[in-house]
Amino acid sequence: MKKIALLGSTGSVGTSTLEVVGQHPEDFSVVAMAAGTNIDLLTLQVETFKPELVSVGNEKAAVELRDRLAGKSQPEIVYGAEGLELVARHEAANFVMTAVVGSVGVAPTLAAIEAGKTIGLANKETLVSAGPVVMKRAKEKGVSIIPVDSEHSAVYQCLQGERMEDVAKIILTASGGSFRHLSREDLEQVTVEQALAHPNWSMGAKITIDSATMMNKGFEVIEAHWLFDLPYEQIECVLHYESIIHSMVEYKDRAVMAQLGTPDMKVPIQYAMSYPIRKKLPTEPLDLVKIATLHFAAMDYERYPLLKLAYECGMAGGTHTAVLNAANEVAVDMFLKGAIRFLDIEKVVRKTCEAHSGVASPELADIFAADEWARSYALVSI
C-alpha cells in the first residue's frame, strides 16, 4: 500500500489527490497532510482520511483545528514551515505528493528527498527556483521524482521504455489560456474574473493567471529541462486549443509519441501515485470521433513575452529562474488583489529579472537569497 504524505491538501491538486485515494482505499492511505488556513475543508479531510500528522499555515490555524476536532480522535498538529517539512519526512509515508503553490515547496521537497521518499511533484516552482540543487540531491539519494503536471506526466509516459539519447525534442502543448483570442490591446482592460476563467482546466487562482500570461508554460519549460535533463533547444512549445494532446516526444527517427486524454488532473495524479501500475479511474473517456478535429498553432513569443523570458532565464541558469519565479509570484498576487493591471505582471517580472546579476552555480542559500531579493524588488517596482 502507498502511504501518502500530502502537501497542499486543500488546494486543487490536493483535493483531486484525495478523490483518487477515496476511490482506491485498498491501495492508498493518507498518513500525513499539510494545508494553509482553510480549516473548514481541512477539518472534513482529517475526519475522513484520519492522518497521523497534520500541518497548518500558522499557530492560529493550529489552535482552530484542535478546537474543531475536540472530543474526537486527533492527529498530531504542527504548523508553519517546520510543519511542512515534518509532514514531508513523516516516517510512515513512502510517497510524498507536493501540491503546495509557490517556492514554499522547495524546503519540504528537499526534506522528502533526504528522507528517501518517492515524490509526486505537482509544485513546479520547486524546480524552477531550485532545479540544480533538488535534482542533484535526488540523484545522490536515489529518489524518484514523478511529475504530476499533465504535460510532464505525458512526456514521462512517452519516454517509458525509450533511451534519452534517442530523443530529438519534447513538445509541450499549451491551450493559450483565458485570453488566447484577445489582442495585446484588449489585454490592457481585462479583469481578474475574466483571467480566472480557463477554457479547459479547473485549477487554482495563481496557476490560472500563469496560464493566461503563459508564464505557466515558461515554468514548465524550465521544469522539463531539469526533469528530463534536456537542453532548452530540445524543448518546444506549441499551441493546442483543445488540451487533448497533453504533450509529445519526437525521436531521432521522426517518430512522435503523444499522450492523449480528456482534461482531468486526476489522471496524472493517479499515474504518479500508482506508477508503474495503471488503475481504473472513473473519468470521462476520450471520444476522438466526437472531438473530430484537433487544432494547433505556432507559439507566438511576442504575444507571450513571459514565455520568451522563461527561456532566457533558463538558458542564463543559476539564480535567474529563482528570481523569475519570485517576481512572478509577487506580480500575480498584486494583480489578484487589484493593485496592478494584467499586463503589468509582465512589466514587473521583466524589470526584476533584468535588474538581477545572478549567481552562476548557486547553493540553496544563494537561491533563497535571490528569491528574497526578487520579492522585495518586485514590490517596489510596481
Swiss-Prot record:
- Is DNA-binding there in the keyword field? no
One Pfam family for this entry, by name? DXPR_C
Transmembrane residues, as ranges? none
Residues binding Mn(2+): D149, E151, E220
Q: Which residues bind NADPH?
A: T10, G11, S12, V13, G36, N38, N123, E125, G204
GO molecular function per UniProt: 1-deoxy-D-xylulose-5-phosphate reductoisomerase activity; manganese ion binding; NADPH binding
Q: Which InterPro entries match?
A: DXP_reductoisomerase (IPR003821), DXP_reductoisomerase_C (IPR013644), DXP_reductoisomerase_N (IPR013512), DXPR_C (IPR026877), DXPR_C_sf (IPR036169), NAD(P)-bd_dom_sf (IPR036291)
Q: Where does 1-deoxy-D-xylulose 5-phosphate bind?
A: K124, S150, E151, S175, H198, S211, N216, K217, E220
| Pathway linked to the protein | Isoprenoid biosynthesis; isopentenyl diphosphate biosynthesis via DXP pathway; isopentenyl diphosphate from 1-deoxy-D-xylulose 5-phosphate: step 1/6
Cofactor dependence is on: Mg(2+); Mn(2+)
Highest taxon of the source?
A: Bacteria
Tell me the GO BP annotations in alphabetical order.
Answer: isopentenyl diphosphate biosynthetic process, methylerythritol 4-phosphate pathway involved in terpenoid biosynthetic process
UniProt keyword Nucleotide-binding, yes or no:
no
Q: Which PANTHER family match?
A: 1-DEOXY-D-XYLULOSE 5-PHOSPHATE REDUCTOISOMERASE, 1-DEOXY-D-XYLULOSE 5-PHOSPHATE REDUCTOISOMERASE, CHLOROPLASTIC
Name of protein: 1-deoxy-D-xylulose 5-phosphate reductoisomerase
Q: Which organism is it from?
A: Brevibacillus brevis (strain 47 / JCM 6285 / NBRC 100599)
Q: Which gene encodes it?
A: dxr
